[in-house]
């Protein structure tokens, strides 16, 4: 074998090695990309599920406080919590004409027929009014950011503290027949903001 043939074979071997190395790196990068996309998709799905759950539990607590199981919990704080956790599709629906009609009818009834306006409707109507009149900075920017999650976390922590105090201690809040329903609901309120803040930081 001549020197020229040896050099040609060596060059082809080096080229093949480089191609194989590049292919291996490409495959590894593709696998990492698929893994990262899957993780992000999982996080996004988990966030959406927890957001729905947070809204449902907040509404549940709002209804529960209007029944015979009334507590000393400040349920008006659930209004801003629901505002910040309400899923976008529902928020957009109520911020449109449907919500405006409800707000208009409620205001007219409240002004001209105050005795006919039920007390239990005041908080839901207040929530719809806030959704309708909130500026875009609050309605879309803050709601979708970590700021909204921090506000929800502060509200949930305060409600949990007040509920424990009203129940006569941490143990009683989990053992009393009426208190445990509120306790489970309030603990559920903590999950979504903690999850959201964690993934905003990390």
Curated annotation (Swiss-Prot):
The chain crosses the membrane at residues 43-63, 73-93, 98-118, 120-140, 146-166, 182-202. Its main location: membrane. Residues 1-42, 94-97, 141-145 are extracellular. Residues 64-72, 119, 167-181 are cytoplasmic. InterPro entries: COR413. It comes from the Eukaryota. It is a multi-pass membrane protein. One of its GO terms (cellular component) is plasma membrane. It is found in: Cell membrane. GO terms for biological process: response to fructose; response to glucose; response to sucrose. Keywords: Cell membrane, Membrane, Transmembrane, Transmembrane helix. Induction: Repressed by sucrose, glucose and fructose. Slightly induced by turanose and mannitol. Belongs to the Cold-regulated 413 protein family. PANTHER family: COLD-REGULATED 413 PLASMA MEMBRANE PROTEIN 2, COLD-REGULATED 413 PLASMA MEMBRANE PROTEIN 4. This is Cold-regulated 413 plasma membrane protein 4. The lineage of its organism: Eukaryota, Viridiplantae, Streptophyta, Embryophyta, Tracheophyta.
């Amino acid at each position: 074998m001549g020197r020229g043939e040896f050099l040609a074979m060596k060059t082809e071997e080096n080229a093949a090695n480089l191609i194989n190395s590049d292919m291996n790196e490409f495959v590894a990068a593709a696998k990492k990309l698929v893994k990262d996309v899957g993780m992000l998709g999982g996080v996004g799905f988990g966030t959406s599920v927890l957001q729905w759950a947070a809204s449902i539990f907040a509404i549940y607590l709002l209804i529960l406080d209007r029944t015979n199981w009334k507590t000393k919990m400040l349920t008006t704080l659930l209004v801003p919590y629901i505002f910040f956790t309400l899923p976008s599709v529902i928020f957009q629906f109520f911020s449109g004409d449907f919500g405006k009609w409800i707000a208009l009818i409620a205001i007219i009834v409240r002004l001209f027929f105050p005795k006919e306006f039920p007390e239990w409707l005041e908080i839901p109507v207040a929530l719809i009014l806030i959704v309708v009149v909130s500026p875009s900075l609050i309605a879309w920017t803050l709601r979708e950011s970590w700021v909204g999650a921090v506000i929800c976390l502060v509200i949930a922590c305060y409600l949990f503290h007040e509920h424990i105090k009203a129940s006569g201690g941490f143990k009683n809040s989990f053992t009393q027949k009426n208190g445990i329903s509120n306790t489970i609901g309030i603990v559920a309120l903590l999950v979504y903001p903690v999850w959201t803040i964690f993934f905003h930081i990390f």
